[in-house]
Amino acid sequence: MRNLKTTVTKSIIVFFILFLISNACSRNESESDPDMVAYVGDRKISARDFQLNYEFGFAHLKKTNDRKYFYLKYMINEALLSQEGYRLGLDKSERVKNQEAQLLEELLVEELFRKKVDESIIIADDEIKDAITKSTVKWKLRYWVELNSEDAFNIYNSMQVSGYTKVVQEILASNPEENRDLKDLETGYLTWLDIPPELLEKIKDLEIGEISKPIELQGVYLLVQITDITRSGISDHDYKNAYNRFKQILFYREQKVRAASFVTNFMNPKNVITKGNEFKILANALSEWKQRSSNSDTFLESVEQAGKTEPVLLEMKNNLGNTFITYVDEDWTVKEFLNRFDPHSIKAKPFNKQLFRKQLKHQIAITIRNYFFVKEAISEGLDRSEVVVNQLDVWRNKWVYEEARRFYTTDIKIDNTEAKKYFNDHVSRYVTQIGKQPDFSEVVSQVKRDAYIEQAKRLLETKIEQLKKNSLVKINRAVLDTITVSDSDKSRGTNVFLFKSSSGRLAFPTVDPAWGL
C-alpha cells in the first residue's frame, strides 16, 4: 500500500505491434515494392518486419559495424532453414503442433475480446478533454492500513482526538520490528490517474488535514489524510500534446470495465461449479510435484505413475476419474481438466499455501473461461480471421526453423577429448576477472557448451550456403539503409523484450540469440 500509483497497461504497444505485423504479413507486394527489404525464396521480409525484429532483438546481435545488414542476414538464415524444415515435414512434428494449438487458443481468446469488447469502445473528445483537465489537480496524502474494520474504526476515532501523526507514531513505536516511519506512509503528488477510482471517490472532497473514515479497498481498510492539494492551468498546446496519451488511458480503463462485464455475462449462464474435495486433492498433489528438485515428466504423467511411496500423488491418481467441474449439461473429470491445464501457470511457491491456492483457483477459472471462449470464437469464424491466421504463420515459421536447427545439429556430441582440445586452443577465453587461469575440470561444462555452439554454427552456415543455391535470396540494400532503428551505444547494449500480458509470450518472434554466440 506504500505506493498507490497504478500504471497504464502496455497492451496498446502489443496490440499496435501485432497489428503492424499482421498487416505486413497479409500484403501482397511485388518484388519491386519499396517496402520489401529482402526476398528469401517465396518469402518476403518487409521493412516493418525487420524494424520490429531488430528493435526487440537480442543486443549482442547488433555489435558489428554494419549492424542492420548482419541482423538481416540472421533473419534470412532463419527463413532458409524454416523453408527447408517445411520441405522435411518438420511442421508436422509434435512440438510444432502442440505449440500451434496453444497459440491458437491464445489468439482466439484475444480476438474474441477484441470483437466483443474493444470494438464497442468509443472515447469521445469531450471525455479526453475532461480527463486532461482533471489531471491538473494533484493530491498529496498519507495513510494507514488495517486488516479489519473494527481496528480501523478504533484508530480513526483515536485520530479524531489526537491527530494522525501522534496516533501513527505511537503505533510504530510499539512495533519497532516493522522498521517503518511516517515518511514510509506518505505519497508524492498524485493525479486521478494514480489513485484507484473507488478510493478517489471517497477522498476527492476531503479538505487538507481531514482524515477519511475507513475505506475498504482490496480486502484491507485505509485511513487517508490529505496533506496538500495543487491545481495548475493547462494551455491548448498542452491539450494537443496530451490528447493521444489520454485517449489510450481512457480506452484501457473502459476496456477493463467492459471486459469484466463481458466475462461475467458470458460465464454466469454456464453455472460452472468446481468440486471442493477434488480441488484440495489437486492443490496438495500439485504442491508436492512442484517441490521436487526435478520433474522430467509432466504433472499428469507423474500422477499416473504414482505409487505407494508417493501418497499425495497416489490419492490424486485414484481420483482422476472423479467429477471436478460441472456446468450446464456437461462436466469434466479431474483428468479431463488436467489435459487442458498448464501447471506451470502457477508461479507462487508451494510453501506459501494461501497464495498458491489463490493462484490455482484463478488459473482454474481462466482454463474454464478460455475453453468456452475458444468454442465461441470458432463458432463465429474467428479462427479464419486475418490476425489469427497471420500470427499463426509467423510463429509456425519460427518453430519450424527451430526444428530444422535441431534436426541438423542433433548428432553433434562433444566428448572430453574434443573439449580438452577446444580449451587448449581458447584458453584465454576462460581466464577469470582476477587473471586466474582455471583448470579444465573447473570449466568443462562451459567448454563443452562453447565447443558445441561453434560446431553447430559452422555446420549450419555450411547448410545455409547449400540452401542458397536452390533459393533466390535478394537483399534490397536501398530499403535497408532507409530503415530507422535505435542505434545508440546504450540501446545496442540493452535487451528490450515485449511480452503479452495475457499469456507471458513474446509479442512476436525475434532472431535466435544463438547466431551471435
How would you name each of these model-derived features?
Residues 21-24:
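C-terminal motif of bacterial Sec signal peptides marking the signal peptidase cleavage site
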